Amino acid sequence: VVSPLLEDYIRNNYPKYKLTSSTCKRITDPKALEEELGRDYHIVVVDYDFNNNWEVLEKLPRKKDCELLVNACCEPNCPRRSAHYRCIGVQQIAYNEHIKKYKNLPFDAAKYDPENFRNCPYSQRGIFDIRGLRTHITPDDIWNKYVPMGFEQFKIEGRTASPLNVLETYMYYMAKPECRDEARFTLLKTLENTGALIFK
């Protein structure tokens, strides 16, 4: 959750529901992050500007309840990220309303993007473009630094990314380097055989 109104509603009406503190809150102050971890959230998604910031990460309580976004495409310290998150929220609400009323008409997200976030150059970055960012967490870092420190939850971004970028990201994070080529081929072949991927 990011909205206090929604959080209060869930806490009052569904007191056993497990709440996640969203990265959309953009908690960038280390003290505020520690305070957030002191509340009764099931998971706190850490702002990825803290990725690889060992001085802050080592001091965090409840590391096992922190979730880290490993492959952020956004520019570190982006001043527009909060506004972009709000825009995405507005678009999601508009989309839900649209499909209730107009099931067979396509949704035009541009109508709900007055700040033109859909053309943000960073949102088009792929797995090969982001590896140089200071916020990027490599598979080796996960196993050799984060897990030994007590972190257990890692999240891969990609809901709105190109399917081919998602595929390559999965290969990077979830397949051993020596198995990636075969895993990639097997997945692509399966997608082709099922009609999910069509080559023209």
Which residue stretches match the model-derived regions?
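Active-site pocket-lining/capping segments in soluble small-molecule metabolic enzymes
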Residues: 1-32, 36, 41-200
